[in-house]
């Protein structure tokens, strides 16, 4: 996929892993995740709704962090839970497990998933593997590895499915920032309107921006462009998760960007449980991934926005995601733009 990215320094895998696991060694990220009530409550409910499949069974928690999901599984009746966590937060997980008197049922393993050896196959895999735009951090790769090596035939994966969505959006904040430069003369007597183009290039750049998007900013119904079945998806398929989209605008506005989000689904006997990061639902710590066009495009009621979108690993750091969008808005010609996680996240600390 060399056509997708500008060539930069490629990090070796050990450096990628060090950066990734080191980022989970501080309390801040765990506070953010556990304080996300949508995330944590949905996982708790998803686990308890599958208690019949968990009770008396063996569970593998991939990327266990503080061990909260392992504890939910133990509370749901699991006989044994292997909580695998490679970062130093595993030391805190051991303390939390002990504090909750679950040492006899939860074993915290401080190691990468790919290097562990378990005494037995597992009945259930649970993992909170999702990153920004679903695939950032590529933790799903470890879940697939665990599935292929450790999960019994017919075993359960929680969550079991993921879906990706896209929609065009308006951004009044960006609009205001661009308009600002035309107001400077009226305020200070100095014309700085020539800064508008420079500001546009700086703001509407090639970064994947993680921001909350309000319902009012979304200009069409969401369009699902990809679905991942965790029981069958392969590592090869994750090298390029792609799909097409076709949206119809609600009314007159300006498209500044595309917005990408995801859902994951927990199976249940009656009604499946969905964890959604949609702008139409309560905000989560994942927010939404915003992909800015080079220039805003004016649209009217029923203007069609069509195209293809592809998510793939960065050539410089395989744990980081890149996104390419090829799109046509109304009668305009086809445009293409590639996006990546900002450079500061690629640097070794």
Curated annotation (Swiss-Prot):
Can you tell me which residues form the catalytic site? 128, 137
Which transformation does this protein catalyse, written as a reaction?
L-arginyl-[protein] + 2 S-adenosyl-L-methionine = N(omega),N(omega)-dimethyl-L-arginyl-[protein] + 2 S-adenosyl-L-homocysteine + 2 H(+)
- Location in the cell: Nucleus
A single GO CC term for this protein reads: nucleus
GO MF annotation list = histone binding; histone H2AR3 methyltransferase activity; histone H3R2 methyltransferase activity; histone H4R3 methyltransferase activity; histone methyltransferase activity; protein-arginine N-methyltransferase activity; protein-arginine omega-N asymmetric methyltransferase activity; protein-arginine omega-N monomethyltransferase activity
Q: Which GO terms describe its biological process?
A: chromatin remodeling; DNA repair; methylation; negative regulation of DNA-templated transcription; negative regulation of ubiquitin-dependent protein catabolic process; regulation of DNA-templated transcription
| InterPro entries in the cross-refs | Arg_MeTrfase, PRMT_dom, SAM-dependent_MTases_sf
Signal peptide start-end:
none
Q: Which family, according to the similarity comment?
A: Belongs to the class I-like SAM-binding methyltransferase superfamily. Protein arginine N-methyltransferase family. PRMT6 subfamily.
Known role: Arginine methyltransferase that can catalyze the formation of both omega-N monomethylarginine (MMA) and asymmetrical dimethylarginine (aDMA), with a strong preference for the formation of aDMA. Preferentially methylates arginyl residues present in a glycine and arginine-rich domain and displays preference for monomethylated substrates. Specifically mediates the asymmetric dimethylation of histone H3 'Arg-2' to form H3R2me2a. H3R2me2a represents a specific tag for epigenetic transcriptional repression and is mutually exclusive with methylation on histone H3 'Lys-4' (H3K4me2 and H3K4me3).
What's the protein here called?
A: Protein arginine N-methyltransferase 6
The organism of origin for this protein: Danio rerio (Zebrafish)
């Amino acid at each position: 996929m060399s056509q997708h990215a500008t060539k930069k320094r490629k990090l070796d895998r050990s450096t990628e892993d060090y950066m990734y696991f080191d980022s989970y060694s501080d309390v801040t990220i765990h506070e953010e995740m556990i304080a996300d009530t949508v995330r944590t409550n949905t996982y708790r409910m998803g686990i308890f709704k599958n208690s019949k499949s968990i009770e008396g069974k063996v569970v593998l928690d991939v990327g266990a962090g503080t061990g909260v999901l392992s504890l939910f599984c133990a509370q749901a009746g699991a006989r044994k839970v292997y909580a695998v966590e490679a970062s130093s937060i595993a030391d805190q997980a051991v303390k939390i497990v002990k504090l909750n008197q679950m040492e006899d049922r939860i074993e915290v393993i401080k190691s990468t998933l790919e290097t562990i050896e378990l005494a037995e196959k597992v009945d259930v895999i649970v993992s909170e593997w999702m990153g920004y735009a679903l695939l950032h951090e590529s933790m799903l790769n470890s879940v697939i590895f665990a599935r292929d090596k450790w999960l019994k035939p017919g075993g359960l994966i929680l969550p079991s499915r993921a879906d990706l969505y896209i929609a065009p959006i308006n951004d009044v904040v960006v609009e205001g920032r661009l308009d600002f430069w035309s107001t400077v003369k009226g305020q200070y007597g100095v014309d700085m309107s020539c800064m508008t183009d420079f500001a546009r290039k700086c703001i509407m750049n090639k970064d994947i921006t993680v921001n909350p998007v309000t319902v009012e900013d979304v200009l069409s119904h969401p369009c699902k462009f990809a679905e991942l079945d965790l029981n069958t998806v392969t590592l090869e398929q994750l090298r390029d998760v792609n799909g097409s989209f076709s949206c119809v605008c609600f009314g007159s506005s300006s498209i500044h960007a595309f917005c990408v989000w995801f859902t994951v689904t927990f199976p249940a006997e009656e009604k499946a449980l969905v964890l959604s990061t949609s702008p139409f639902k309560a905000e989560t710590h994942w927010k939404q991934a915003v992909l800015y066009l080079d220039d805003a495009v004016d649209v009217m009621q029923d203007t069609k926005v069509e195209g293809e979108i592809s998510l793939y690993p960065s050539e410089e750091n395989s744990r980081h995601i890149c996104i390419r969008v090829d799109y046509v808005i109304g009668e305009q010609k086809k445009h293409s733009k590639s996006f990546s996680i900002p450079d500061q996240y690629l640097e070794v600390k």
